[in-house]
UniProtKB/Swiss-Prot annotation:
InterPro entries: Beta-grasp_dom_sf (IPR012675), DRG (IPR045001), G_OBG (IPR031167), GTP-bd (IPR006073), GTP-binding_2 (IPR031662), GTP1-OBG_CS (IPR006074), P-loop_NTPase (IPR027417), Small_GTP-bd (IPR005225). It is found in: Cytoplasmic vesicle; Cytoplasm. Expressed in actively growing tissues and reproductive organs. Mostly expressed in leaves, stems and siliques. Also present in flowers and flower buds, and, to a lower extent, in roots. Residues 367-399 are annotated as: Disordered. This is Developmentally-regulated G-protein 1. The gene is DRG1. Binds GDP and GTP, and has low GTPase activity. May interact with phosphatidic acid (PA). PANTHER family: DEVELOPMENTALLY-REGULATED GTP-BINDING PROTEIN 2. Residues 63-288 form the OBG-type G domain. Belongs to the TRAFAC class OBG-HflX-like GTPase superfamily. OBG GTPase family. Its main location: cytoplasm. Keywords: Cytoplasm, Cytoplasmic vesicle, GTP-binding, Lipid-binding, Nucleotide-binding.
């Protein structure tokens, strides 16, 4: 019996089993078995060659967005309108057979947009080219799930199920569960929050299913069995997703209003070029990109080439800015002068941990510059008060 058949057999058993207090331990074990089998399904077969065409393209720009959806929902047309890159579009299905990249120039940043082939139900099991499509989606910073507003709402659930089957968690955050394997000592189970979905006994059974007999487990929130399995697997990708309903020009106003009110959703029409500007703004907000401008000593800020940080990847602190400029700048920095909305006054003397916001201006003062320049360095800043110069340290008073 193959892996896919075993997964379907366990799913059928779960569907037959009534959910109650007496069967929750058995269902938890079945969920762990399915998670293990799906992980094996994604592993490449032993001895397989590297032949075959893949979809992976070189990352470019300050972020990557993947277009996911069923065939003929308007992904290629959307790519052409947002990037100017030509992607073959037609009225028949499976027009796009490979990954077509494009670049969006927005707010002085470059965002890579990938038009992926349409996926079908069963893509997580290898049908069509679903595995390759989903693998590229895992490397993206944001997923745009393009849906046909005139089709059934079931398409959204099918696509979400296929993505979650391969370890993608849409619009979720990693569960607050600490898990660490040990060589000896048995299983240590602790919790700092009341648990209503899982208990110590079920936790032990799931760990034994993975043949883990020595580990430390700490629940910091009311997590579920699926959350605990995700932590054990350790290969889940938590990614933001925006549900883009296209072709709203062929449905009624009531349907448009209903779809637009759904969480993480936006309605557009590629045919009428409707709401595309709001889609770009939504993409920008979801990706959490932050532009930071550098200001050399005694010069005007460079507003042409910002340093782009991300709140999701890495962070948005002065230390992150220094690492973007040069890896040795953190060691050489004395302090930073920051102008912008993240400070109480302009400029503000800040350290490495200062959080930066969009369009902040940063000037790094190095240790050598401060030692050589002395107090006169601060006189070049028109906004700095006269008392900003360092005060000499006085010896403590004698008792």
């Amino acid at each position: 019996m193959g892996i896919i058949e075993r997964i379907k057999e366990i799913e059928a058993e779960m569907a037959r089993t009534q959910k109650n207090k007496a069967t929750e331990y058995h269902l938890g074990q079945l969920k762990a078995k399915i998670a293990k089998l799906r992980t094996q399904l994604l592993e490449p077969p032993k001895g397989a060659s590297g032949g075959g065409e893949g979809f992976e393209v070189t990352k470019y720009g300050h972020g990557r967005v993947a277009l996911i959806g069923f065939p003929s929902v308007g992904k290629s047309t959307l790519l052409t309108m947002l990037t100017g890159t030509h992607s073959e579009a037609a009225s028949y299905e499976f027009t796009t057979l490979t990954c077509i990249p494009g670049v969006i120039h927005y707010n002085d940043t470059k965002i890579q947009l990938l038009d992926l082939p349409g996926i079908i139900e069963g893509a997580s099991e290898g049908k069509g080219r679903g595995r390759q499509v989903i693998a590229v989606a895992k490397s993206s910073d944001l997923v745009l799930m393009v849906l046909d507003a005139s089709k059934s709402e079931g398409h959204r659930q099918i696509l979400t199920k296929e993505l979650e089957a391969v370890g993608l968690r849409l619009n979720k955050t990693p569960p607050q569960i600490y898990f660490k394997k040990k060589k000896t000592g048995g299983i240590s189970f602790n919790t700092t929050a009341p648990l209503t979905h899982i208990d110590e006994k079920l936790c032990y059974q799931i760990l034994h299913e993975y043949k883990i007999h020595n580990a430390e487990v700490l629940f910091r929130e009311n997590a579920t069995v699926d959350d605990f399995i995700d932590v054990i697997e350790g290969n889940r990708k938590y990614i933001k997703c925006v549900y883009v309903y296209n072709k709203i020009d062929v449905v009624g106003i009531d349907d448009v209003d209903r779809l637009s009110r759904q969480p993480n959703s936006i309605v557009i029409s590629c045919n009428l070029k409707l709401n595309l500007d709001r889609l770009l703004a939504r993409m920008w907000d979801e990706m959490g990109l932050v532009r930071v401008y550098s200001k050399p000593q005694g010069q005007q800020p460079d507003f042409d080439e910002p340093f782009v940080l991300s709140s999701d990847r890495g962070g948005c602190t002065v230390e992150d800015f220094c690492n973007h400029v040069h890896r040795t700048l953190v060691k050489d920095m004395k302090y930073a002068l920051v102008w912008g909305t993240s400070t109480r006054h302009n400029p503000q003397n800040c350290g490495l941990s200062q959080h930066l916001e969009d369009e902040d201006v940063v000037q790094i003062v190095k240790k050598k510059e401060r030692d050589e320049g002395g107090r006169g360095r601060f006189k070049s800043h028109s906004n700095a008060p006269a008392r900003i110069a360092d005060r000499e340290k006085k010896a403590p008073l004698k008792q």
